[in-house]
Amino acid sequence: MIPDSLNRKEIRIDPSSATLETPAAELFDSVVYVPLQTIKQSIFSNIDQMEVTRKCYVILDESLNTIFLFTKDGKFYNKIVNTDKVAEGTFKKIGKFVVDEKREEISFLDPHSFYRFYYSFEGKYLRKMPKVISGEDFYHMSTGLDIYLRSANQILYRSNKAFFESNPTVATSNILVLDSLKKIRYGYLPLDTSTVALDDLYGVAQTFYNNHNGRVTLSIPYNYNIYEIDSIGKMSNTYCFVLPAMNSLPNDFMKNPVYKANRVSYLNNNKNAVYSITDFYQGDKLVTFRLVNALDLHNFLLYNLETAELISMIEIMPDHACFKLPMVQRRIYAAANNHFFISALSASTLFSAKEKLRKDKNWEKQLPQHLKKFYKGDQLQNPVLTLLYLKK
């Protein structure tokens, strides 16, 4: 199917013109710091994926092959790890996980087995089910739909070939929507397999973004559009990015056979060319996103849909809104109800900031009690979440 583009909005930006050193108080009503409890059972280092539910933060550290569960005030209460005493619940590897708020379940595909594993929000093993299809990324909607991203290699290898025998027209779709009976409902964004070679395309860490509005936002590499899929699986094209020529891929980059088997080398030779727009979250009149190119810069940007102002998030100036502390480090991990974005900082980053502020005698006195408690610990504590509450 072709996504509906009737209400698509154009975002025309020049990354080099992004405003620097915008005061935090001009963008955020407040910034709340949530230290994630550090005890022996809860220690982790990387946030590779995070989902926010009404009850908890769900955090995956891929290096530990573990999902950690924290309450909304940062208290650790359980984790999902493959040493479960229930033999049936033993998995080999956590792939991407999804949450079902309605059923209060966490599930993930194990790339090294034939199963999808299900756990409760309390971290209790529930069941495992045979995988229906493999994907580079996937998303679950509370209406029962599962949405899969299939990589170019998976399409070219014709993985899950038998699955498509009843519906061959969607076999080259990058995006598949399956209903609760595991039948294909829709296929979107087909790949022209005649112009793409194996290992021809870079991937990205995440495709689907939960904006908590009953729909899921998504973007795929080599495509400057942002899409949404609604509760019944219909896709719409909501935004289209227009970049300067020096930052853009050729218009025929995915169609022209001259680029076949040469796309990686093209990007290595044209390092300013953006090949993906990731981490797209919307908060009322502001959207945040990251431009990905071969330079591998932390190019987090904030765009005002009303004024068209472009702001570098990494350069936002700390002030009284955030206790003069940094707010963003690696990326934006989530958004909640159009009201705030969520990022995270390492403990060492916050201790470095404290060292720079030590001459300000009144600074520490103004900190909330939970941050004062955090600073009584050391730099080896768990990361600290930052909730960036947007100005109305």
Residue ranges and their predicted role:
Residues 47-51, 95-102, 143-152, 201-214, ...:
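Structural signature of eukaryotic scaffold interfaces centered on beta-propeller domains
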Residues 39-40, 81-89, 131-139, 191-196, ...:
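Short coil/turn segments at the loop-to-beta-strand junctions that recur within blades
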Residues 338-392:
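Blade-level signature of beta-propeller repeat domains, shared across WD40, Kelch, NHL, RCC1
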Residues 1-35:
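Blade/loop signatures of beta-propeller domains
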Residues 239-258, 262, 307-337, 351:
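Conserved blade-ending motifs and adjacent loop-strand segments that build the rim/top face
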Residues 110-171, 188-194:
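Asp-box/WD-like beta-propeller blade repeats and closely related beta-sheet repeat scaffolds
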Residues 121-122, 170-182, 224, 299-307, ...:
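Beta-propeller blade signature
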Residues 37-42, 46, 66, 75-103, ...:
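Blade-loop segments of beta-propeller domains
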